[in-house]
Amino acid sequence: MVSNQDYTERIRDLMKDHNSWMESSINLIASENITSSRVKEALISDLSHRYAEGLPGERLYEGCRYIDEIEEITIELSKKLFRAEHANVQPTSGVVANLACFFATADVGDPMMAMEVPYGGHISHAKVSAAGVRGFKIYTHPFDFENMNIDADAMKKKILEVKPRIILFGGSLFLFPHPVEEAVEAAEEVGARIMYDGAHVLGLIAGGYFQDPLREGADMLVGSTHKTFPGPQGGIILCREELADDIDEAVFPGLVSNHHLHHVAGLGIATAEMLEFGSEYAAQTIRNAKKLAENLNELGFNVLCEHLDFTESHQVVMDVSDIGRAAEISKKLEANNIILNKNLLPWDDVNRSDDPSGIRIGTQEITRRGMKESEMSEVAEYIKKVVIDGRNVKEEVSEFMSSYTKVHYAFEESGAYKYMEIL
């Protein structure tokens, strides 16, 4: 008979197995990353047990003497990194951050313009998720299929036509900067707020690359803190000072009771790391993405946007419909310790999420493990061996990845997937 303690040991063993698998894998999931040992230390601290409702200095609980200072430091570091007038670090996810901005700046029934999901928009921008929860009427940005981006001229005309309360940029399939500056004049004419969901590219923006939404005219920059930004899972809102009170009230008491204090501490540490190393990390992530795209293209894969040098972000996107089903290809690669995901492409029906045409790749985690352009040809070759040649390369991949076990772009190089055993 299995005892309750046996289950605790089983779960512990599974966590260790997971860490070992990740260490021996090429992880190309575009929405994930690895944190430094200092961030991990924060995540297992006593802060994970505590409550601190409200803002620093205005808590509803006692016992927040040190918690207040941690959050204040994290807020100030975030404002410095993003050159923002105001920062709220309490959202427990990127979707919660989005929803807080929706509640703070618009009402039920208001129109919002956003990317359609197959075009690259995140599900929280759609009626079935956070935007629908707020009761928005959703209008989609006109899309340029060839250039995989919003059609700026058509967008400006549509803004004047539908008069949205929020113009939302950003998405989860995100190769090139969005036309924020081009929207400003039309937004001012119709009284719209410009919101930028930087969840995927937040680390690139922090490093001074991709684009600078707050300088280009966005009122709000929001995102999750664990994709290209190598922090703990959570969300952040950066905005103009005039929106600060409404944003803070939308977060608490509006959407979040107690936020995750250990994640706030981890975010503060990760933000300090990005202030120190973010520029180098972001630049290398983009260089790796461009090189990997070039290598895959040379090997015969249909990598999108060759005419635009493939990408300006951490992402590489392939249409694999001419060689197989993306769902099957991603499973074959997973069996060979190459982890990525199938993805809808703009020409796919939104209901085909289980059987789309595309593969999405991200280079941020392998960059954090120390890879540079020279390794991208090997990564591309392993993908080809599995997908085109039908070979098993699991052992080769594991051996290859044994040289990349440390976290880079941090104050000390530590084991990327070391299991932090306490007992």
From Swiss-Prot:
Binding-site residues for (6S)-5,6,7,8-tetrahydrofolate, renumbered to this chain: 121-123, 242
Compartment(s): Cytoplasm
Stored CDD domains: SHMT
Presence of the UniProt keyword Amino-acid biosynthesis in the record: yes
An example molecular function term from Gene Ontology annotations: glycine hydroxymethyltransferase activity
Site (Plays an important role in substrate specificity): 226
GO cellular component terms listed in the entry, alphabetical order: cytoplasm
EC code(s) of this entry: 2.1.2.-
Main location: cytoplasm
NCBIfam families: PRK00011.1
Alphabetized HAMAP family for the sequence: SHMT (MF_00051)
Family under the similarity heading: Belongs to the SHMT family.
Protein name: Serine hydroxymethyltransferase
Organism: Methanothermobacter marburgensis (strain ATCC BAA-927 / DSM 2133 / JCM 14651 / NBRC 100331 / OCM 82 / Marburg) (Methanobacterium thermoautotrophicum)
Lineage summary: Archaea, Methanobacteriati, Methanobacteriota, Methanomada group, Methanobacteria
Gene name, Swiss-Prot/TrEMBL: glyA
